[in-house]
Each structure stands twice: as structure tokens, then as C-alpha cells.
């Protein structure tokens, strides 16, 4: 349960943090947008340390699937652009890869 919550929280924190930089550089928002953006990015990094995984790289790779879903949700809910069929097809392919990483049998 904590892994799922950590992944979702990390995705929201990462997207919000990166969007703060996007807003500053691309949308002409105040430089003050960077302060909460940096806090969000630090929170993102911390939350990924809570994931139950024996290897950081595997945790990050599996997180990629969560990030993609969260990014498409952000695209639709915050930016007002509905994901198209290519967004959804690409996401499905990536989610399959993330599932293989997460649930594949491991040699111990």
C-alpha cells in the first residue's frame, strides 16, 4: 500500500515541480514559481525512497508507468487537452513494460 501511495505522491510532486519551471520559462510566470517547484521536486525524490524495492533503478523504471498515467491526467485536467489515441497507445505500451519490470519473476 505504501508503495502505491508513494508512486502516486511522487508523480504529483514531480509533475507539479516540473510544471513550475515550465510556467516560469515558457508561460512567463514569476520567478517565485520556482520555490514551490523545488520543494515539490525534493518531495518527489523523498517519496521514491519509500518504495519497497531492492534496487533504485527498478523502482524508478516501474515508477515510469505511474508517471505516464499521471502526466496524461495532468494534460487533461490541468492543461485542458484530452489525450489522443497516440498518447493512449504509447501509454499502453509503456505500462506493459512497467508491468513486466514490476511483476517479472526474479532470480535470487
From Swiss-Prot:
Membrane topology per record: Multi-pass membrane protein
User: Under the cellular component aspect of Gene Ontology, which terms does the record hold?
Assistant: plasma membrane
Q: Where in the cell is it found?
A: Cell inner membrane
Q: Where are the transmembrane segments?
A: 5-25, 31-51, 61-81, 88-108
Task: Give the family, as the similarity comment puts it.
Answer: Belongs to the UPF0060 family.
Q: Which residues form a coiled coil?
A: none
Q: Which organism is it from?
A: Nitrobacter hamburgensis (strain DSM 10229 / NCIMB 13809 / X14)
Q: Which HAMAP family does this UniProt record tie to the protein?
A: UPF0060 (MF_00010)
Name the UniProt record assigns to this protein: UPF0060 membrane protein Nham_2004
Keyword line: Cell inner membrane, Cell membrane, Membrane, Transmembrane, Transmembrane helix
- Read off the SUPFAM superfamilies from this record: Multidrug resistance efflux transporter EmrE
Highest rank taxon of the organism:
Bacteria
Amino acid at each position: 500500500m505504501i508503495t502505491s501511495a508513494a508512486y502516486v505522491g511522487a508523480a504529483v510532486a514531480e509533475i507539479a515541480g516540473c510544471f513550475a519551471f515550465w510556467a516560469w520559462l515558457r508561460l512567463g510566470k514569476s520567478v517565485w514559481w520556482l520555490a514551490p517547484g523545488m520543494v515539490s521536486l525534493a518531495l518527489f525524490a523523498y517519496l521514491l525512497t519509500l518504495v519497497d524495492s531492492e534496487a533504485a533503478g527498478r523502482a524508478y523504471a516501474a515508477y515510469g508507468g505511474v508517471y505516464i498515467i499521471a502526466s496524461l491526467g495532468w494534460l487533461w485536467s490541468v492543461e485542458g487537452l484530452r489525450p489522443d489515441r497516440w498518447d493512449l497507445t504509447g501509454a499502453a505500451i509503456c505500462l506493459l513494460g512497467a508491468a513486466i519490470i514490476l511483476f517479472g519473476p526474479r532470480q535470487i
